[in-house]
Amino acid sequence: IAYMWNNTLQPSSNPENPDLLSIYIPEWPERIMIAYPETGLTLILGSDYFGEAKKSFLRMAMYKVKEEGGLGFHAGSKLLRVYDKNHELKDVGFIMFGLSGTGKTTLTIHDHGLTGEEKSIVRQDDVIFMDENGYCVGTETGFFIKTEGLNPEQQGVLYKAATTDRAILENVKVYDDGKVDFDDVSLTSNGRGIILRSEVPNTDDTIDLEKANKIIFITRRNDIVPPVVKLNPDQALEAFMLGESIETSAGDPTKAGQSKRCVGTNPFIMGPEIEEGLRLKEILQNNPDMECYILNTGSVGAKGDFKGEKLSIKVSTTIMKEIARDTINWVEDEEWGYEVPVQVNGIDIEKYNPRNYYTEEEYKVLASRLKAERKAWLAKYELAQSTRS
């Protein structure tokens, strides 16, 4: 476990005197994690899962960053260098929030089909620290990826990195001859791998992001949430506090498909969660050049035996590319208050309009249910809905 964690870190300037310490006792009869933020100590009892080591250190680091006036986010980061609608070459920084299984790593590492002077540059996959100006400090030189179903056709970059001699695999089927089978989930569906950032194309020597120009809240819903919506700061606060998606096999396989909410899509938060949401809203209000979006990587229109029109990786990566280029035409959705796209280059966006798949009454029932769920969740934080969402 220590070897795995070391493969995600930059060299330490003072390895003999660590700021944070985590102790595993896997033989403990109960599974309990105890964190002491004042001293930086975490006890991991009854588990030998590497993810608990990663979570223990990043949880503590986020807490200390918050104490110093910043924010720690469970988010990936990248830079898209694109020609905008005025044909000017610009660097656009993205950070992407997302629970396990929503596609955060896939979207972080994807090249978006950019060529020539246009390119995608990967910064971080999992945790960043943001200051009041939107500058994001990176934390790791390795990526902790979900391996279930990994294949060279759809996720070539990740597959190649995960099958090198330097990759470290956990809960993955490996045969005697060394062949790796990412489709075999007989051990568990939560297969994982640590890949080195240097093994991933489109990386450079920098893990920091100069500015988070675009903030993406990734969700995975299957009915009435559009492929992408654009948010104002109040709506962004709500999206952050909702941390909305559905459960996947990477989380709790017994609840896969059920609604799930986690503030900031971040299981690392210590202290009052509302403080983090309000601080993010303040940063957005003070930096009007930072824009927020919800990106749905699930499907739209699910009903009965129809699982919905799938929002493919190509759809999501194209949307992000056109957000960076500032070429999307937006209109306000009168029912929800946020903005929705009416034209996206490279996509027949009307094909993914949720309203096309339901009768007016069916849509009304689903919308009322979702609004009620959101209202009940936000009420826990004494946060009244400030929008129609």
Region annotations inferred by a language model:
Residues 82-116:
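Glycine-rich phosphate-binding P-loop
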Residues 112-127, 134-135:
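Post-Walker A helix-loop "phosphate-sensing" segment adjacent to the P-loop in P-loop NTPases
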Residues 1-93, 118, 131-389:
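A noncatalytic interaction/capping subdomain that flanks phosphate/NTP-handling catalytic cores
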Residues 98-100, 123, 293:
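Short conserved micro-motifs on helix faces and helix-strand junctions that flank
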